[in-house]
Amino acid sequence: MSGTLVLVRHGQSDWNLKNLFTGWKDPDLTALGIEEANAGGKALAEYGIKFDIAYTSVLVRAQHTLKLILDKVGQPDLPTIRDQALNERDYGDLSGLNKDDARAKWGEEQVHIWRRSYDVPPPGGESLRDTGARVWPYYLTEILPRVLRGEKVLVAAHGNSLRSLVMVLDKLTKEGVLALNLATGVPMVYKLKADSTVASKEVLGDMSGAH
């Protein structure tokens, strides 16, 4: 019997609040981000799931989110694997810049293309396609085999690394994934079939606040 895959985007970070491109930079959660992570953990506790293993990125905002969730579900010592394959999209030269300042420097249209096109990367950075090119193989080799063995796996990561996974799981087109926004701290619970396709998906919270 196939297992369960739960995906959670980290809570709001300091740089989300300051409207900065974050990428592989490493700010922590805001007070609101901590609340969001705790709410996600509470939702999972009420759902009644117990995990076998967790995965997260090497960035503190995702790791902090995971810790708060695991505390809420009563599994603070759950085995956890941290890998940069699950890191946020690398924004390259945009990293650390205020989004309005970036628009002033490169023009609103160009920055919009970098942010919202599927395959055009910012200078020195990754496109969404590039992000998926490292996330998806990691999922196939490290995470999916555990789910197919019947394990319950939690992944706490980032907006774009998770969008790369959801694109394939939900069979979204390029246009569909570009329109997809994942709310911070809201768990998505996937039950997978033996052939690795999705049997069911349940969202434990409100995705309308996604950004």
UniProtKB/Swiss-Prot annotation:
Keyword Isomerase (UniProt): yes
GO biological process: gluconeogenesis; glycolytic process
Entries under Pfam families matching the protein: His_Phos_1 (PF00300)
Active site: H10, E88
Site (Transition state stabilizer): H158
Sites where the protein binds substrate: 9-16, 22-23, 61, 88-91, 99, 115-116, 159-160
Record EC number: 5.4.2.11
InterPro entries per record: His_Pase_superF_clade-1, His_PPase_superfam, PG/BPGM_mutase_AS, Phosphogly_mut1
UniProt keyword annotations, A-Z: Gluconeogenesis, Glycolysis, Isomerase
Single Gene Ontology MF annotation: phosphoglycerate mutase activity
Matches recorded under SMART domains: PGAM
Pathway: Carbohydrate degradation; glycolysis; pyruvate from D-glyceraldehyde 3-phosphate: step 3/5
Catalytic reactions of this protein: (2R)-2-phosphoglycerate = (2R)-3-phosphoglycerate
HAMAP family membership: PGAM_GpmA
Function: Catalyzes the interconversion of 2-phosphoglycerate and 3-phosphoglycerate.
Quaternary structure (record): Homodimer.
Entry similarity comment: Belongs to the phosphoglycerate mutase family. BPG-dependent PGAM subfamily.
Name of the protein this chain belongs to: 2,3-bisphosphoglycerate-dependent phosphoglycerate mutase
Species the sequence originates in: Rhizobium leguminosarum bv. trifolii (strain WSM2304)
Gene: gpmA
